[in-house]
Swiss-Prot record:
The gene is HA. Major glycoprotein, comprises over 80% of the envelope proteins present in virus particle. The extent of infection into host organism is determined by HA. Influenza viruses bud from the apical surface of polarized epithelial cells (e.g. bronchial epithelial cells) into lumen of lungs and are therefore usually pneumotropic. The reason is that HA is cleaved by tryptase clara which is restricted to lungs. However, HAs of H5 and H7 pantropic avian viruses subtypes can be cleaved by furin and subtilisin-type enzymes, allowing the virus to grow in other organs than lungs. The keyword Lipid biosynthesis does not apply. The chain crosses the membrane at residues 526-546. GO terms for biological process: clathrin-dependent endocytosis of virus by host cell; fusion of virus membrane with host endosome membrane; fusion of virus membrane with host plasma membrane; viral budding from plasma membrane; virion attachment to host cell. Its main location: virion. Pfam families: Hemagglutinin. It is a single-pass type I membrane protein. Residues 16-525 are extracellular. Palmitoylated. Belongs to the influenza viruses hemagglutinin family. This is Hemagglutinin.
């Protein structure tokens, strides 16, 4: 009878229940936090762009200036091989090969060439302006050329420059000036010819000891030719040295020379400024558009970081060295373990998420006589979703300051500066990378803690409604001391549960259950005594049987003494 009673006690019908839980899915997304690595979450957002299209494109609808085989110097001076660049429209950036073939056809140098390239990073269009027409030099020959710049086998020269030489065995002082009334700054380039020997000097200029003088309100430069024997380049032992200046509005530039002057025929009015740059690339322009260009290809993204290439032009994310930057937006993804039953711990007491709850992050599962089912808590889910969305957008917005990083060039005399610049840039990249990774780790920690807190808050909200009308099962579930139909369950979920309505029924059932527990104690004691006696008797019978068997086959000698 006692055994039957005990069985009935253990197989009593479970009361109606409601449980608090959270969403789980089949996601394999992993994030890192300050304290953990590779935490699987239900939802995440990658904020690091890793891809490009491998193309050189128009930037915001404006094509780049494609120099082809020409260098910056070849374009601006007018190398005959660069005639297609004599007039160019507005550009978004400049495409220059690493080692362009057509630069200074007449061998020489270009002073402050790297600074000139830096100037071009803020210019989007030059307008060519004739400042010193070739026919104004009536006392000098202006048809000078060289086979080094030949066109179709005939000697030629830089299209935008004029090489002044003797005329009629005479070279009078050459003077020219230009007043900048264009309304914009103007780029002016001129040159000085350095002959190979004195014979060449007299042949071209008649004079020895010549000079070239250039002056503006901010510039006073006087040069004399260096006559020297040099190794031949392009068949020439002489050299040309080019210089440049920016002529301000309403300022005047004056040229004076007794020989060796390479005069400018054209200046370049800076007609449009803006973010530009020189893209070192061997590629060609393709039929595509982008907002961010790298030497490897275009990036089209709204993400705040990328790891494609450190050099960019346009509206670009920040470059970082990271391989992974993923923000958690969902919860820890811990699907329920079937062997543990339906419920189980996020927030410290719920062991697994519900894949059956698909319309919210947090919610309920109930079971009663009418059935069972899942229901999301829309209010807490929506608040959490809005909060996390706003946070992610804020992080992206704060870190998505459009960033442009064009390469800086240094002359051979500035290698120490170049090395220092590289170290500084590497240092900045390290700082950006560290900041980005730390930001992600901290935000992920906060997001997961935020979800844990929301689940616990929902649990506490339900517990405050139900009070002692239920029993806390310790796994996120409550068992009612009263019958709770679907209407009752819905009232718990929407926060309108009527505690007084069920208080009396719950009190009676609670006391009854306690009485059953107390009366069952005697049963447990009887069963314990019965089990002990039965076990001892069974052991004694078994030992006696073994002894009798051993005595009968001689294995054990039995002596009975009286």
């Amino acid at each position: 009878m006692a055994i039957i009673y005990l069985i009935l006690l253990f197989t009593a019908v479970r009361g109606d229940q409601i449980c608090i839980g959270y969403h789980a899915n089949n996601s394999t997304e992993k994030v890192d936090t300050i304290l953990e690595r590779n935490v699987t979450v239900t939802h995440a957002k990658d904020i690091l762009e890793k891809t490009h299209n491998g193309k050189l494109c128009k930037l915001n609808g404006i094509p780049p200036l494609e120099l082809g085989d020409c260098s910056i110097a070849g374009w601006l001076l007018g190398n005959p091989e660069c005639d297609r660049l004599l007039s160019v429209p507005e550009w978004s950036y400049i495409m220059e090969k690493e080692n362009p073939r057509d630069g200074l056809c007449y061998p020489g140098s270009f002073n402050d060439y790297e600074e000139l390239k830096h100037l071009l990073s803020s210019v989007k269009h030059f307008e060519k302006v004739k400042i010193l027409p070739k026919d104004r030099w009536t006392q000098h020959t202006t048809t000078g050329g060289s086979r080094a710049c030949a066109v179709s086998g005939n000697p030629s020269f830089f299209r935008n420059m004029v090489w002044l030489t003797e005329k009629g065995s005479n070279y009078p002082v050459a003077k020219g000036s230009y007043n900048n009334t264009s309304g914009e700054q103007m780029l002016i380039i001129w040159g000085v010819h350095h002959p190979n020997d004195e014979k060449e000097q007299r042949t071209l200029y008649q004079n020895v000891g010549t000079y070239v003088s250039v002056g503006t309100s901010t510039l006073n430069k006087r040069s004399t030719p260096d006559i020297a024997t040099r190794p031949k380049v392009n068949g020439l032992g002489s050299r040309m040295e080019f210089s440049w200046t920016l002529l301000d509005m309403w300022d005047t530039i004056n040229f004076e020379s007794t020989g060796n002057l390479i005069a400018p025929e054209y200046g370049f009015k800076i007609s449009k400024r803006g973010s530009s740059g020189i893209m070192k690339t061997e590629g060609t322009l393709e039929n595509c558009e982008t907002k961010c260009q790298t030497p490897l290809g275009a990036i089209n993204t709204t993400l705040p970081f990328h790891n494609v290439h450190p050099l960019t032009i346009g509206e670009c994310p920040k470059y970082v060295k990271s391989e992974k930057l993923v923000l958690a937006t969902g919860l820890r993804n811990v699907p329920q373990i079937e062997s543990r039953g339906l419920f189980g711990a996020i927030a410290g007491f719920i062991e697994g998420g519900w894949q059956g709850m698909i319309d919210g992050w947090y919610g309920y599962h109930h079971s009663n006589d009418q059935g069972s089912g899942y229901a999301a808590d829309k209010e807490s889910t929506q608040k959490a979703f809005d909060g996390i969305t706003n946070k992610v957008n804020s992080v992206i917005e704060k870190m998505n300051t459009q960033f442009e990083a064009v390469g800086k060039e240094f002359s051979n005399l500035e290698r120490r500066l170049e090395n220092l610049n590289k170290k500084m840039e590497d240092g900045f990249l390290d700082v950006w990378t560290y900041n980005a990774e730390l930001l992600v780790l901290m935000e992920n920690e906060r997001t997961l803690d935020f979800h844990d807190s929301n689940v616990k808050n929902l649990y506490d909200k339900v517990r405050m409604q139900l009070r002692d009308n239920v029993k806390e099962l310790g796994n996120g579930c409550f068992e009612f001391y009263h019958k709770c139909d679907d209407e009752c369950m819905n009232s718990v979920k929407n926060g309108t549960y009527d505690y007084p309505k069920y208080e009396e029924e719950s009190k009676l059932n609670r006391n009854e259950i306690k009485g059953v527990k107390l009366s069952s104690m005697g049963v447990y004691q009887i069963l314990a005594i019965y089990a002990t006696v039965a076990g001892s008797l069974s052991l004694a019978i078994m030992m006696a049987g073994i002894s009798f068997w051993m005595c009968s086959n001689g294995s054990l000698q039995c002596r009975i003494c009286i």
